Amino acid sequence: MSTGWIVLGVIVILVILAFGAYNRLVTLSQRVNQAFADIDVQLKQRHDLIPNLVETVKGYASHERGTLDDVIKARSAAVSAQGPGQVAAAENQLTGALGRLIALSESYPDLKANANFQQLSNELSDLENKIAASRRFFNNTVQEYNTGIQQMPAALFAGMFGFTRKDFFDLGASRAEVEQPPVVKF
């Protein structure tokens, strides 16, 4: 066999490996994008629920203006956040503000007994559980993608094709506070 055939064989193998690595990385990248879109759907539902919850609380605890304003500001920041890092930080703030809003019900028995408040609180709790599940799926998908771009032979081609590490949906320093959905007691 001549050297030319050997070189051609090596080039063909490298091209096949490059195509295979590229296709796998595209698939993994699309999974990450879809997983983030799933989180986004849940967050939008939560954002839509918040104005009703604030209005219900306002009817019973209108002098708790600071807490209500905090929730409204946190919601606005969360709605306008872009990308996993910003969204996670904004949602972290919103979760804290919502926890304080729900805690107000302890001080207002009439609010706590209100059927609309109970329904909205239950919906919020359900959404928090769905968000937590979506977040876990997203982070697992990101882990799979990040591992994929570091494994051979994809690691040889990942940078060349523009595939870079993706960030986890991280809750930051106060992770313990928001790891579990807010507890809603009636």
What label would you give each PLM region?
Residues M1-F186:
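A helix-centric hydrophobic-segment signal that preferentially recognizes long
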